[in-house]
Amino acid sequence: MVVQNSADAGDMRAGVQLEPFLHQVGGHMSVMKYDEHTVCKPLVSREQRFYESLPLAMKRFTPQYKGTVTVHLWKDSTGHLSLVANPVKESQEPFKVSTESAAVAIWQTLQQTTGSNGSDCTLAQWPHAQLARSPKESPAKALLRSEPHLNTPAFSLVEDTNGNQVERKSFNPWGLQCHQAHLTRLCSEYPENKRHRFLLLENVVSQYTHPCVLDLKMGTRQHGDDASEEKKARHMRKCAQSTSACLGVRICGMQVYQTDKKYFLCKDKYYGRKLSVEGFRQALYQFLHNGSHLRRELLEPILHQLRALLSVIRSQSSYRFYSSSLLVIYDGQEPPERAPGSPHPHEAPQAAHGSSPGGLTKVDIRMIDFAHTTYKGYWNEHTTYDGPDPGYIFGLENLIRILQDIQEGE
């Protein structure tokens, strides 16, 4: 939706009204939908620098970087608040002196207030169906209009860790929770005409009908070199109490399409923090299960890409991907049954990103969230490292091993 920018009197440039990204399954920072193939998130200069100096070998495993936009609050005639994005003019301040978005400061405050008080409502089910909306209205806009508050009852089930039914919602609650918390703080702490810088990134799930997404926090260490002692201790405690310490990886969120009941099964980071090693293995199994059967044909292409990523990470000397995540993505919509004598749908050659040799089923493996990534050559870096990231490699090796066990039926 294009709107007129009301941030400055006399400055009536066209803008894009942002929508919540309904397939966000983890993270604190609100991710917004810019268009069908693009999402945006508050700009962190370290992350922007990473994307702009990205090693060529890593590009296939990261979202495409599409630049930046400025974002401001916009109020429509009914008083409804939303975020509107405008392209950044070339004449604006250069990259090297850009400051952190005020939106990032709000996100960091949100981390402090929600970091340890997670809800026990860790499993949600939401139907992937059309909400009641006008022909030109997207599902995200209809959702915001029909459910303006987080605790508004709707259609789908949310359970606690004991399986008790406690709440019903019509959407994956995590992305909207991040969006509404972010919007509330922006509204209360900054004027309407305050401009914030956002990154534009590829929407890596846009090509999927029913995107199944697993968000994995990688590595044995999650705090950046610039973390305060309090934050460092908090992150070290989370790692020690989760599979991050013993496996180098933990679940930060996931959604899995259940074909039998036509809804997404959703779990959040609080669920992931409580898992044992065996619980982590069972969660990976569940991520590959559609409610009817295990999607075994996904295992080989996922393993193929993870091994390729492992090879790339081993070649990236000095890089430390602290607090970054790894997305595993596939389509919950299975290919149609083949006719007798026709090629198997999983054997058809694919040229799209994420395809594997031999025409393996389409999957995507993408690294995201580089706000705390460090490497030699980063501007004004005080701490540098030698060799590849041992914690990330440890996590990838264990992830591959567990998926191999599932593949072999153990």
Swiss-Prot record:
One of its GO terms (biological process) is inositol phosphate metabolic process. Pfam families: IPK. Detected in brain. One of its GO terms (molecular function) is inositol-1,3,4,5,6-pentakisphosphate kinase activity. Disulfide bonds: none annotated. The keyword Kinase applies. Its main location: cytoplasm. The keyword Repeat does not apply. Its EC number is 2.7.4.21. Substrate binds at residues 211-219. One of its GO terms (cellular component) is nucleus. Residues 333-358 are annotated as: Disordered. It catalyses: 1D-myo-inositol hexakisphosphate + ATP = 5-diphospho-1D-myo-inositol 1,2,3,4,6-pentakisphosphate + ADP; 1-diphospho-1D-myo-inositol 2,3,4,5,6-pentakisphosphate + ATP + H(+) = 1,5-bis(diphospho)-1D-myo-inositol 2,3,4,6-tetrakisphosphate + ADP. It is found in: Cytoplasm. Keywords: ATP-binding, Cytoplasm, Kinase, Nucleotide-binding, Transferase. PANTHER family: INOSITOL HEXAKISPHOSPHATE KINASE 3, INOSITOL POLYPHOSPHATE KINASE. This is Inositol hexakisphosphate kinase 3. It comes from Homo sapiens (Human). The lineage of its organism: Eukaryota, Metazoa, Chordata, Craniata, Vertebrata.
